[in-house]
């Protein structure tokens, strides 16, 4: 256990020497995606082969440095998820993609023993080999601050976190700054909450610090519920100590002695890594009573949620931690006044807390130098959808959407045309190619009718039906509605019913205007922020793709030929040989005709399964 500041400084220096002594390191991505692809088997095989070669393999960082050892580590997410499982070789910085256990022998023989690049495992594009991670276009335009440690250290080791300067910000906050100075530093940095609306974190901390209550709480929102979003999960898995350090600093600044991390149970790896980090921090005297001999107490507990989307809302989240049903309540009072257990509470999300140690260590002015003035810093995004390179990216606020999608993401998969990007999850909106040069910051997106939200970016190509996209998100929101307020409970249900009729070819004149009217009512009268933003995907798709809605309603036609019930399958008489094969495979008997004469489809019976299209050898059956 570290008893004082000197102990912490000595431990950090000792572990740094031990880490520097590992002249060769193998970092196996052990994020959820790569683990699913076999990363743990790769890690075990690398250890076995190194030991078999006679070299000294070091899995856990020792207290004392040892020369000539090869460090083999399970790191956090590297971000290039499309190419996993990933293995990074240091000190060269080589990144190997799509690694399998059978590749390990060549990696050891050539890269560790022979110090040569295994070219077949390196990333290739445009007839060029990109040996190092830093050279790969996916990484080249990123600025990784929050994700800086992910992929570079053992995510389960407090020793490695200390070795790279970990808990230096906590040390500074404990010994060199007053509570007011910490709050002022966060205020001056203009760090805005990374979980949704972008409320200034420093302002929230100041409000809680001014409360006279003897009991206060720090709560981290790790309930990442947006479809396709995995930024917070990756931070919790890859750099848990960084997030814990941010929470500890918030506790010192606001006078809180207890913190909670609310994380969904569907994130078992994140929960496991957090539990390990908390135990380690307690063992080292960085959590608990009398931290580093200062007389300050602060401890953290984990509360696992059951996956309800509405529990991402502040008052619903605190209710869930208390053991109640997760339902939003009327405000005021707000969480800064009466939050968890009716006490003043700082509630920020994972990425917000992960920014704090760097701000305290390097200063508010440094932080404001990254990104635009009103939205400084970086933002992590989960890049998914019809894009060449899906994964986790981090860019400075204000980076144009085009740069993220085309320069980092590699553009649209298969050479198709870009159509839209859904940003902000179910509470966000769809942006079009006219918005590609829009800077990704809170204010610019709000003006465009969207929001950053937690940071999900779902890219859609020209074959995507925007009416179906709106129906998908409305179905999600309606299913996740807590049902407490009528506007959200009933309004989203009516909107979903209208959208389902439209994609089924049963749309009526006036449906589009009714959707907009319902959207306005729900947005202006719903109880919580989730209800107020529930209609954003519908409003933005109508605004930007009204012609698609009109085609569905007025012409009973889906322009992208995506909506199953709007498909029309026909038989071209000039191509039909009358072989009857299509009629024989039709499961509902919708095709009839005479042998050696053109057959015909009864549109009323046809279920659009497409079996006849696959069966026809003459390509006479096709979608109209």
Each predicted region: which residue ranges?
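Short amphipathic, charge-patterned alpha-helical segments
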Residues: 50, 246-248, 397-413
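Gly-rich Lys/Arg/Thr-decorated short loops/hinges at beta-loop-alpha junctions or inter-strand turns
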Residues: 153-168, 220-232, 335-341, 382-387, ...
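Flexible inter-domain linker/hinge segments
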Residues: 122-188, 342, 348-363
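Iron-sulfur cluster-binding cysteine motifs and their immediate structural context
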Residues: 83-87, 487-493, 581-600, 611-624
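Ferredoxin-type iron-sulfur electron-transfer modules in oxidoreductases and energy-metabolism complexes
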Residues: 2-24, 40-72, 83-85, 90-123, ...
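Conserved phosphate/anionic-ligand binding catalytic regions in large, soluble enzymes, centered on
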Residues: 30-38, 82, 186-208, 250, ...
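C-terminal accessory/binding modules appended to enzymatic or scaffolding proteins
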Residues: 377-389, 395-397, 401, 559-603, ...
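Hydrophobic alpha-helical positions that pack around
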Residues: 271-397, 409
